[in-house]
């Protein structure tokens, strides 16, 4: 994320779609690195269709019409948006992303999508107008965290080649040169790479391809729907509003600290992720826990995954 920001956003007008704490990270990177101060942030909000549930209101992204209008007004060089926001379980639909792309391209800018938490919900960069897609070996790919993955179309590559990064180690243009050398059968050096981790990642990609990428995508949605159904049966409310619920990261409300911190689940032998703030103006009482449904092991054993979770949840709630 920082490599992309330092290469493409330095002293530029930027617009950020912030749906939670991990898209707040764009703001942290821009401020800490003094990359640009010309930034517009559009935050998630309580959905119009959210019924009266006290403090447990469901969130949705800024309306796409508002985002498009802001892009047309501010004319950003870069729009940063999260496909899936890990803190909220919010996922941007394909059509939402396409409209972002169309809008930013109409003013000469680039669309950068953070797909680190997408799981196996693959995005078609060309069809959706994504210029830069960021991912990582962990989570959906089920591999060892060791590097950042930056995929770029021709427009993004052209912009990288005509800009200068403000970092040595995270110089995206330099790493693009390194990658090209390897693609052409050569070798180049900029910094020592995590070779073992990268080879493990290569093997995991091959494993996923052998299973079938479309099959994994379908499995991701099926698993997410079944886990959400279990939660709904226990009257546990999703933070993400209907239509924006990610199948790979499910975030739900709780009033119990031991569930919020994950300790209640750990006592039943189940590891989950503790809740984190959204940084979108949510109330101080905001308290959640998060379920990461990543991993080839889960996607190839959906019924077993759902059964183990349901059994643990019932013991936690007993």
Give a label for each model feature.
Residues 138-229, 297:
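Active-site C-terminal subdomain of aminotransferase-like
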Residues 25-37:
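Active-site-proximal loop->helix
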Residues 12-16, 193-263:
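Internal helical hairpin/lid segments
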Residues 126-138, 148:
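Conserved active-site segment immediately N-terminal to the catalytic lysine
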